[in-house]
Amino acid sequence: MDSRDSRKYCLTLHMKTIINVKWRMKKLLLTLLAVWCMRATAGAQAFDEHFVDSTLRLDYVLAGNNHEQQAYFCKASKMSRWAGRKNRLAEMPLKGNGQLILSDHATGRQLYVHTFSTLFQEWQATEEATRVNRAFNVSFNVPLPKHLVDVNITLTDFHGKVVGQLQHTVNPADILIRQVKEPQLPFRYVWKGQVQSDGEPDITRCIDLAIVAEGYTDSQMEKFYTDCQRVVDALFAHEPFTSMKSRFNVVAVAAESADSGPSIPHLGRWQSTAVGTHYDTFYSNRYLMTHDMHRLYDLLAGIPFEHIIVLVNSDIYGGGGIYNHLTVTTSDHPMFRQVLVHEFGHAYAGLGDEYFYDDSYETMYPADTEPWEPNLTTLKDFGSKWADMLPKDTPIPTPPAKIPDYRKVKTEAERQQLNAATQRVGVFEGGGYQSKGVYRPAQECRMKINEVENFCPVCSRALVRITDFYTSQHNSHK
């Protein structure tokens, strides 16, 4: 074989190799696509086997004191369309302080799991709860079952022990389940993460976030819609939300109030508003919250939603966030953006407060129990938290670095030092309102102070994980 034939042979062999590699890559991609499609289809089939594409609303009252919890069923209603997840239905991403489980009545098989926390359970940590019984109402949306189901409500204490439980049966054909046909209030989408061919938002592939007007009169509704756009801009200006914006829909719900602004009890000001929010919750001036979840869900009847932000028409600092319950924030305070993002971290991803006091009334995170919040640890089971993110040879507890006092920052260089502290992962003592025995993952974070821009890496991962969970198109962790 001469040199020319040799070069021709090598070139032919090389081309065959390239073609074979390309073919193998194509087969691999087709196989992966087929597996993804089968998993997505399997998820849809699992949902369709047990549920219809509608919503069942369940209303309860939770009552008790600092050591007792009871749950009482009130009523049920149903609405067209289901805005929640259709995959990973029986999985529990976070334990929360309570769990709602739907099980098939005939077989006992778990069909759907929803975890949550409530204002009632926060109240149990107050001094008032040691001397009086109180009741709070809650509502839950679940997919409408095709057949008879058992509903199990479980309430846990600070040790994770079950202290309250209710089980009852729901028959979807029950004539006393009220059918809600149309939305009761005007609403407008201010952001659509994904749209269908008809231009409507895709409520199956996206997380549906409802912003409800509170303390806005009829003449202030255009201000409300403008404020809602500010909410969208503020929330998605922060990572990891910026990168996940296409996985959210945001709908503005124009709930009209007779009076402008919320109630302020310590000033003797009581208003007539759509949701009934007020400052001074649990006698804390800044704690702005509503006690009436039934009323809030009534306003949202017929509107697809999974998470709620109550936007309060006020320039006074305040707000609150409770896991899988609601976020409350004010519209016009100078720190509106920071408060919104912090409180939404609580409500959406179950992130705990990373600040602490030396005189906390109640130990909410006892040493013998690992917190369920992903960004707090008592070291009881640190391996389940951010141990995998800890740099090698990091001491536990991690000594804090010398950084500027966030209350005295004046220069850009000092602000950069503070923000840099959010990205150093360690095990810093102090968190969950307790100065001792509870540890947080970063020296500073959006869940600790308002003066930094970023979530720490541990909180960011938690936000991404919960978003992946809600928007998953298949039924596997992998």
Q: For each predicted feature, which ranges?
A:
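Fold-level signature of zinc-dependent metallopeptidase catalytic domains
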Residues: I175-E239, A252-P262
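Beta-strand-enriched, solvent-exposed domains that form extended recognition/catalytic surfaces
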Residues: H50-R178
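Solvent-exposed loop/turn segments at secondary-structure junctions
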Residues: G215-D218, E256-S260, S314-G318, P334-F336, ...
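Active-site-proximal segments of metallohydrolase catalytic domains
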Residues: R247-Y323
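Bacterial Sec-dependent N-terminal signal peptides
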Residues: M1-F47
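Active-site recognition of the HExxH zinc-binding catalytic motif
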Residues: R337-E354
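Short pre-active-site segment immediately N-terminal to the catalytic Zn-binding motif
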Residues: K223, G320-V341
